[in-house]
Amino acid sequence: MDRQNYRPRIIDRKVEEYLSAFGAVCIEGPKWCGKTWTSAYHSKSGIYIGDPAGNFQNRQLAQLSPALVLEGETTRLIDEWQEVPPLWDAVRYQVDQTPKKGQFILTGSVTPNHKGILHSGAGRIARLRIMHRPGEIAPGRRIRTNDAKKC
């Protein structure tokens, strides 16, 4: 991510507020609304579970050892966490073990698959919904005001 090209968003203040209050923040929203871009801006490291490189090696690693993909400089971005639901519990456990604020940002679908998640994350993982900004430019297209939908 080229931080110099990042255009500040209204939601940035909320992300910073939540990171200062919780061990992790889960940013949810529709495709192309800027979840990954916004989260990467607020992160110091990250792993992209949906990256097809190496036959989806990041996803495979997350399935084999969820705790291993959490290693890295914090705040750490876990993009598309819902592709490996046990990552949620791994984040919750890590936040319990190291009670620091702003350790992780998880990004994912508005309607994640909760199958395989054992704990709600209450008090540890704050949920934040993001939506398209009217008139915002998304990669490859322009979003018209009437295209904006609330999550």
What is each of the regions a protein language model found here?
Residues 1-151:
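Phosphate-binding site recognition
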